[in-house]
Amino acid sequence: MTERSRSGKTAWDKEKTRELFRRYKETDDPDAREQLVMSHMNLVRFLANKFKNRGEPLDDLMQVGYLGLLKAIDRFDPERGLEFTTFATPTILGEIKRHFRDKGWSVR
């Protein structure tokens, strides 16, 4: 039986994520990038849900959030010892807030 962390991911999942980042950073493997995006889609959904009652469709917010996720994946350095979700959350939120700002809406 594997030990689960508070987030519900097993230690194997975290190690697999680290390995995908190493592979992506070393070889620019598009398959590794795609797997990283797919494995973090729930993070984008969770963060986009915080803004869903602001007059924008959830699908649009998630699309903007995915742009932030892609930026975070491209900029993340696994050697720094930081969890990816900790690194990616401000980038995803920033993209969503920028979307509202560009439309002229105030988000607090």
Where are these regions (language model features)?
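Alpha-helical promoter-recognition and RNA polymerase-docking modules of transcription initiation factors
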Residues: 1-106
